[in-house]
Amino acid sequence: MTEPQRVTIYSAAYDRSPGASHRLLRQATQLYAPGLAEPALASGAHGKPYFPDAPQLQFSISHSGAYWLCAFSAAPVGLDVQQHRDCQKQALARRFFSLAEQAFLERTSHAPFFDLWCAKESYLKFTGEGLSGLEAVCTVSPEGGFPSVPGVNLQLLPLFAGYSACLCTASPAEIREQFL
């Protein structure tokens, strides 16, 4: 049996002030890896942030509404959070969701639009592809199961009322949560 991927998720109130996300990332990094000097931050080809001098520290950041989240692991990780809000869900689904995902939304009583969105975004953060690949990812299996993307583990996270969140890892994750 494969050992679970260990993931620590830090969450904090998010005030959207200039530099807030960077300050919170620095604080979370110091908690996750206390002996590590503050690592430099760089961005991959599609904008995924990483620490070039600390490749053993994989992380993913997301913020929405009043919350900021960051997942740390020794292996690649993707995390997304979305505040439930009024939006043109049908139009967005037609533009960014596969036909299987659109059908899933239609036959599901509580239409988990934001769960689907978070699953897609967390996968793209995991792979480092960026949001340009949003339409190409299908998070519903051919049998209609959700969340499901071959080769990865998608886990919906019930963190905050009125929000959806999803974690994407290479294997099932053992999650530890901590509020900053």
How would you label these PLM feature ranges?
Residues 1-180:
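Core catalytic alpha/beta fold that binds nucleotide/phospho-ligands
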